[in-house]
Amino acid sequence: MADGTVTLRELNRALLERQFLVQRQGITAPEMIERLAGLQAQSPAGPYVGLWTRLDDFGRDVLASATADRSVVKAAWLRGTPHLVTAADYRRHRATLQPVLSAGFHDIAKRRAPGIDVDAVVAAAREHFAEAPRTFAELSAWLTERWPDDDVGAMRHAVRMHLPIVQVPVETGWSYPAKPRFTLADEWLGEPVPVEPANAAAGDEATDDLVRRYLTAFGPAGVTDVQSWSGLPKEDVAAAIERLRPTLATYKEGRTELLGPADVPLPDADTPAPPRFLPEYDNVLLSHRKRTRIVADEHRKQVYLPGLRVAPTVLVDGFVAGTWKVTKAKGGATLEVTPFGRLAKADRAALVDEGERLVRFVEPDAEDHAVRV
């Protein structure tokens, strides 16, 4: 199905709508996480802010309950990075992503420790985690005792990328501390978490599902976009696209083919887009090879920082227009917005209004709250 050329603003508005950044939704936190195919969770507060900006009446207790009842887990996921995902998605797609995780490990191992016996290390670590939840500091000490001549960092990474483990939530803060304990995913969830598909057909079906989910949440997009988001091999993504093609609409951005679900039409390019705050590492900023549909090229260095960090940002008229942070002093909390350029009076007022709610969400116990733009 060919639907013609798509403009930058149409791509922007499609992304905003499919990421629920035009209108907050009245659904549960697990439902939103499922629709987004996971939330980047490198920053402890990130998933909370990401849900706050997308859901009606979202409170910390909502996500805390979902992590406590194990309907949502935090684990290595897309591109090998920590994500919050639904338990159902983790069980279904851990095997789909195992090649991505393995490749991430081998890129490091071939430089630092090519002789590591990965199978032995992972099997031993499984027994170690089966005894009790462990921090990675505890795991490192134990691995060093077992294999004193091997690179402990590489062994630790082998465990993280090959053994299905999830972080154990706590009852304070943002549910997951800076130095969390990990436990076996199958014990936490009460059923096996496979690392290989049952057969080739099951593997293709799962890959198709993941690609379809991406196109629904981030499309229209191309093969290289899916690859950038998931880390899956290009040939696997291309094969999934061909299997899904009868259900997809096809667009052109210049000479590039983009695809999206045929039953999800593009929104109008003039759809109003209210100001929004995004957390660090929000996947909306990381899920396309070419990111101009939301970040202008001249702002890349202010958003994508050294050390692979991604700044918390503000959206104005649908595009990244600045960064933000919360600082505390003398019992008060201030949300500071640093715009990339001059803001219209109405946009500034809307950012202040949104920011006043956000700073109270992030620092509920502060004596005073303020917003500075």
What do these predicted regions represent?
Residues M1-R291, A296-V373:
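Long, low-complexity intrinsically disordered regions
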